[in-house]
């Protein structure tokens, strides 16, 4: 079973380290993680690159979002941008927030549920 996580991020430098480490330290790794950098103006992109440099299954792509503020719109557009950039099909696609900290066996549990 192939599982991909898409994580839209915007100015998450205060949270991204713990989030990335919680994904990297999973008992079962996802097949791919795509961070969609949605025009961050802080060090979010650099931190993602630094913490994930040894994980070839973690990628970051840049999305140029519109400046117009409509609550919830930017994150949906960033997620859809990530979906459009998938090169292969996945059985499960998850959308997580950039500040999420996952329990160590979270991905394993997700895969097990879908395999039942």
Kindly label every feature range from the protein language model.
Residues 89-101:
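Short beta-strand-to-loop acidic/aromatic patch adjacent to the donor-nucleotide binding site
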Residues 12-25:
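Short, well-formed alpha-helical segments that are part of the catalytic scaffolds
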Residues 7-9, 37:
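Short beta-strand/turn micro-motifs composed of small residues
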Residues 66-77:
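A short, glycine-/small-residue-rich helix N-cap motif at loop->alpha-helix starts
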Residues 24-67:
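Acidic donor-binding segment of Leloir-type glycosyltransferases
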Residues 2-4, 32:
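Cell-envelope/extracellular polymer assembly enzymes that use nucleotide-activated donors
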Residues 76-92:
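Active-site nucleotide-sugar/metal-binding loop of Leloir-type enzymes
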Residues 101, 105-116:
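Conserved donor NDP-sugar-binding/catalytic core segment of glycosyltransferases
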């Amino acid at each position: 079973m192939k599982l991909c996580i898409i994580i839209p991020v915007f100015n998450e430098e205060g949270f991204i380290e713990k989030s990335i480490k919680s994904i990297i330290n999973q008992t079962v790794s996802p097949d791919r993680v795509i961070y969609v950098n949605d025009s961050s103006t802080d060090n979010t992109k650099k931190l993602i690159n630094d913490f994930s440099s040894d994980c070839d299954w973690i990628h970051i792509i840049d999305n140029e979002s519109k400046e117009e503020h409509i609550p919830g719109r930017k994150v949906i557009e960033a997620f859809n941008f990530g979906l459009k950039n998938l090169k292969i099909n996945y059985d499960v696609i998850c959308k997580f927030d950039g500040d999420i900290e996952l329990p160590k066996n979270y991905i394993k549990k997700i895969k097990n549920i879908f395999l039942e």
